[in-house]
Amino acid sequence: MFELLLHAFPVAFALASFWSNTERKLLLMNLGLCIAIGSLLVFEQAWGGAVVITVAGLSTSYRLIKQKLLSPVATYITLISMMVIVLTVNNLTGKTSLVEAMPVLTFMAYRFGELHCKEAGLRVCMIIGSINFTAYGIITQTWGLAITEALFAASNLWYYMKLRRAM
């Protein structure tokens, strides 16, 4: 029953993301997803994904608190530093396959969007990251993650299309 709840909690956040019509709501929803998916990945012992999600939650928190974008240089330094942390943990745990690197690719797309892009760019980065993380969830048979990320990609695509029409 507990495992079912861990899989359902992120899906509930993903469904709620269809009401994240502003950048702030999107970031708050992403923070909630980080907590929910992080808990699920720890339970599933998918440590690479869990580390990625933890660092992602910190990045999302920074953007919510500061409410400003980083300069290009600061963005790249931050991304590289975070990527090194995640890849180091993967290496220490012996998780060095391409599948274990997929969360890092998602992480890079999400963090670039959060730290450097305004709403439209942020949504594009989240669409790309969510599609990749959906594939990771399917490959690792973490179904709550796969469904969540597919829904999150769909909601971001919906709002991105609305933004493009408004421009």
Which stretches of residues belong to each language-model region?
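Alpha-helical membrane-protein topology signature
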Residues: 1-167
